């Protein structure tokens, strides 16, 4: 069975996810996902997207020019077997849209529900589902 080292690697993976999303390092962000990752944001007024090649252009179109700050807290990681794990992360994010957009600001709270797979390149996110508990919006005048 897996070790504390695996948990540490998954924590590092998620930390990279948050940092790379906020710094808009899209090609490096690609590397945190499996090629066939499933992204489900339907509970956040979003959609389901299959594959990193579909997800990244969608993500860039949504937040490419938005200043973002994502934080993950209190991970609950379960090692299923040597090469698979599941996780739930409490999350908080803040987003600031550029001038001229209908939304100015969002402060959100919720959870990431994820699965992970160990690959030859280390642990990767194989599925991600975002759920929201609360959102505070500020709209443009």
Task: State the predicted function of each range.
Residues 4, 46-49, 103:
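Charge-dense, low-complexity intrinsically disordered segments
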Residues 26-93:
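A solvent-exposed, acidic/Ser-Thr-rich amphipathic alpha-helical stretch
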Residues 5-7, 21, 39, 82, ...:
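Intrinsic disorder/low-complexity signal
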Residues 1-35:
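Short, low-complexity N-terminal intrinsically disordered segments enriched in polar/charged residues
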């Amino acid at each position: 069975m897996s070790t504390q080292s695996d948990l540490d690697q998954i924590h590092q993976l998620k930390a990279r996810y948050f940092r790379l999303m906020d710094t808009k390092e899209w090609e490096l962000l690609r590397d945190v996902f499996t090629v066939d990752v499933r992204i489900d944001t339907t509970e956040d007024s979003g959609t389901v997207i299959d594959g990193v090649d579909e997800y990244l252009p969608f993500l860039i179109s949504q937040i490419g020019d938005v200043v973002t700050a994502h934080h993950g807290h209190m991970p609950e990681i379960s090692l299923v077997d040597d090469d698979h794990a599941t996780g739930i992360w409490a999350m908080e994010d803040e987003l600031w849209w550029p001038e001229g957009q209908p939304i100015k600001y969002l402060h959100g709270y919720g959870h990431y529900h994820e699965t992970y797979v160990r690959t030859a390149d280390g642990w990767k996110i194989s599925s991600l589902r975002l759920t929201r508990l609360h959102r505070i919006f500020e709209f443009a005048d």
